[in-house]
C-alpha cells in the first residue's frame, strides 16, 4: 500500500532535491503510468516541484539544496497527492506541456501534447521532404494545436492549417495560437477533410486517433482524463487512418507528402496494405509508428485503400 503524503512529511523534507526524490519514490511505489510528456517518475516529480515553486524548467543544480518554506512544501505535496490518488496526468495538474521546445497550455479539452513527430518538426522533416518547397501545410486532427503551431514556429514562411472535429480542442488550440504568437497558423473545424474543400497542400501531417477499442477500454486511469475522441479508433485502430489515406491525395499536390502517426497499429496497417511503400521513420528517441508516404503512392493504390475504408 502506498504511503500517504501526510502533512507530517513536510517536517522531514527540507530542500528541492528532497521533494523531488520523495515524489519520485511515491510515484514509483504507487505504480503510476507515465507517458504524458514524461516517461519516468523522477521527471514527473521534478516538473511538479518546479511548477509549484514557480521556478523555470532549466533551473540550475545549485538551487537543488535550497530550503523551502512549509507552505511551499505543502503546495508540492498536495500536487503529489493528486497525482497518486487521482492519477491526474502531470500536464493537467500544471496546465501546460512542452512539445518541440515550445510550452503549450494543456487541459482536458485535448490530449496532452506528445508525439515523436516533434523530432521531425525540429529536423525540418528531412530527409523526408527531400527539399520540397512547402508553402501550405496541414496538421489534421490538431487537438491542442501543438503540431500545427510547432510547424509554423519553425517554418515562419509556411502557411499552416490545423483542423479538428472537436470545438473544445479547437478552443484550446486557439489559446495556444495566441500564447505562442502563431500568426501563420489557421484553425479550421473539419471532420477529417470535409471542411477543407478546395485546399491543397505540399505536406499533410497527422497524429489521428489510432488506439484499438480493446486497448482503449484497458488503458490506465491516467488516460481516462483525456477525450476518448482523440484515442479510440475501432477494432484495429485504423478506422480514421484509412480514411486519411483514401482522401489525402485530393488535398495534396502531385509531389505532396503525407506523414502520419499510427503507433502500435503499424503492424496491422502493413498487413492490410503490404503493397503500399510506407517509409517508417526511425527516431533518435527510439519511438516508432510514424510513416511517410508519397501522394503518388496513395493514388496508385487508391482502389484497395478505398475498399478497406468503406468497410469501416
Curated annotation (Swiss-Prot):
Catalytic activity: L-glutaminyl-[ribosomal protein uL3] + S-adenosyl-L-methionine = N(5)-methyl-L-glutaminyl-[ribosomal protein uL3] + S-adenosyl-L-homocysteine + H(+)
GO term, biological process aspect, one: methylation
GO molecular function terms attached to this record: nucleic acid binding; protein-glutamine N-methyltransferase activity
EC number: 2.1.1.298
GO cellular component assignments: cytosol
Membrane-traversing stretches: none
Keywords: Methyltransferase, S-adenosyl-L-methionine, Transferase
Coiled-coil ranges from the UniProt annotation: none
Gene3D superfamilies linked to this entry: DNA helicase RuvA subunit, C-terminal domain, Vaccinia Virus protein VP39
Domain of life of the source: Bacteria
Entries under Pfam families matching the protein: MTS (PF05175)
CDD domains reported for this sequence: AdoMet_MTases
Function noted in UniProt: Methylates large ribosomal subunit protein uL3 on a specific glutamine residue.
Family according to the record: Belongs to the protein N5-glutamine methyltransferase family. PrmB subfamily.
Protein name: Ribosomal protein uL3 glutamine methyltransferase
Organism: Xylella fastidiosa (strain Temecula1 / ATCC 700964)
Gene name, Swiss-Prot/TrEMBL: prmB
